[in-house]
């Protein structure tokens, strides 16, 4: 029996499985939306992976995790995590807009989620802390990243219309 009032995302596909036709086809059979953890990329793979997901699953996808680390000016060692790395906090903002503009251009993407609200704890030396958050460890919003994300998010529907021309 199926509850048609629920949205089923299934398990989040990450790593190699998200590139495997059989896995994506199986997810498409049961999921309403394919959930993807999408890391280590400057640009979404519009003509390869994203096109494959559309063909294999015949369902939209949601990027359930992504982030970019600023490695030179975050006061964290940034040795952990799968996020794409750029030199500075300002470049994290550019990376956000670049990546999400690509997702808006994809006809089968229904949204995205930045992985983490706050950076990893910089005092926890056991876990190799990284710059993953929208906020630093003093609860200060990264201003440039916030501005660029807000600017893109407020204009998302107009941008979709532009890409649909």
What is each PLM-predicted segment?
Residues 30, 53-56, 81-84, 131-136, ...:
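Short, low-complexity, polar/charged sequence segments that are solvent-exposed and flexible
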Residues 1, 81-87, 139-140:
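Short, exposed beta-strand "edge-strand" segments with a Pro/Gly-rich flavor and a Y/T-containing core
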Residues 82-134:
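C-terminal structured "cap/appendage" subdomains that terminate the fold
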Residues 115-165:
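Aromatic-rich peripheral "rim/lid" segments of glycoside hydrolase catalytic domains that contact
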Residues 3-81, 97-101:
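Glycoside hydrolase catalytic-domain groove-lining segments
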């Amino acid at each position: 029996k199926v509850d048609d009032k629920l949205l089923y995302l299934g398990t989040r596909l990450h790593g190699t499985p998200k590139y495997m036709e059989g896995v994506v086809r199986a997810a498409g059979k049961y999921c309403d939306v394919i959930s993807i953890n999408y890391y280590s990329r400057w640009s979404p793979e519009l003509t390869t992976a994203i096109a494959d997901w559309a063909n294999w699953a015949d369902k939209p996808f949601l990027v359930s995790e992504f982030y970019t680390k600023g490695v030179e000016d975050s006061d964290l060692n940034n040795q952990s995590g799968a996020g794409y790395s750029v030199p500075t906090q300002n470049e994290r903002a550019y990376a956000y807009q670049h990546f999400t503009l690509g997702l808006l251009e994809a006809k089968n993407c229904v949204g995205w989620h930045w992985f983490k609200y706050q950076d990893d704890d910089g005092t926890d030396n056991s876990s190799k802390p990284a710059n993953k958050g929208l906020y630093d460890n003093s609860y200060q919003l990264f201003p440039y990243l916030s501005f660029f994300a807000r600017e893109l998010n407020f204009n998302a529907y107009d941008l979709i219309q532009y890409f649909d021309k």
